[in-house]
Design a protein with these regions (language model features):
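Catalytic-loop region of hydrolases
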Residues: 17-84, 102
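N-terminal cap/lid subdomain of alpha/beta-hydrolase-fold enzymes
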Residues: 57-164
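Mobile cap/lid helix-loop segments that gate and shape the active-site cleft of serine hydrolases
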Residues: 164, 168-171
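Conserved acidic catalytic loop of the alpha/beta-hydrolase fold
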Residues: 146-149, 156, 171-191
């Protein structure tokens, strides 16, 4: 039994000593379908990282997001007029996971009426998803999920006050949302 402890400790050391970095501005898109109120809904799922920029235009954080857009009969003009729900958890330290797979996303966890998982474990279509009437972006604030602060050219992180606190959250998340809408809906940036 004592050897198992040491093996676990050694493996943990090697896993934690690896430097893992995510690209600060990247995305992956897939296409899916679901049924809501008896109607087939085609939608696009996009996961990615999008930077938070400072006053000088340098990235100071990168936020992980999941973005769902309806595809059925949606023109570019309709997309600009379609409601966008921005969802993130209240934290501190809690990502958007539970809103995502708990109630508004196109897929939800298989759970019973009391909230316990049922077998076979996994996810199922969410007949109450709002993707039929609004697009949804689930955002993980800094230090939740994969979202992180970014070191500057000197290897230093930005001041924590920029990200942790009510006013800081309002400022940087508001800026991030403006950039997101500008990129995804207004189409102001290339390769979005």
């Amino acid at each position: 039994m004592n050897n198992i402890y040491w093996y676990f400790l050694l493996i943990s050391f090697f896993v934690n000593s690896q430097k893992i970095e995510f690209p600060i501005d990247t995305l992956v898109r897939t296409v899916h379908e679901t049924a809501i109120n008896g109607k087939k809904i085609n939608y696009q799922a996009e996961v990615g990282m999008q930077p938070v920029w400072d006053e000088d235009g340098l990235p100071i954080a990168s936020l992980f997001y999941t973005y769902y857009t309806r595809l059925n009969n949606i023109s570019k003009n309709d997309l600009k007029n379609r409601p966008l729900i921005v969802s993130f958890n209240g934290g501190p330290g809690s990502g958007s996971l539970w809103m995502h797979i708990g109630y508004t996303g196109p897929k939800i966890l298989k759970i019973d009426k009391e909230g316990f998982p049922i077998q076979p474990y996994g996810v199922k279509e969410n007949p109450f998803s709002i993707i039929d009437v609004a697009d949804i972006v689930f955002v993980n604030p800094v230090n939740t999920g994969f979202s992180r602060m970014i070191k500057n050219k000197d290897g230093e992180y930005p001041d924590r006050e920029k990200f942790f606190g009510i006013n800081a959250d309002i400022k940087y998340l508001g800026s991030w949302i403006n950039s997101f809408v500008s990129r995804k809906i207004d189409g102001n940036l290339p390769n979005t």
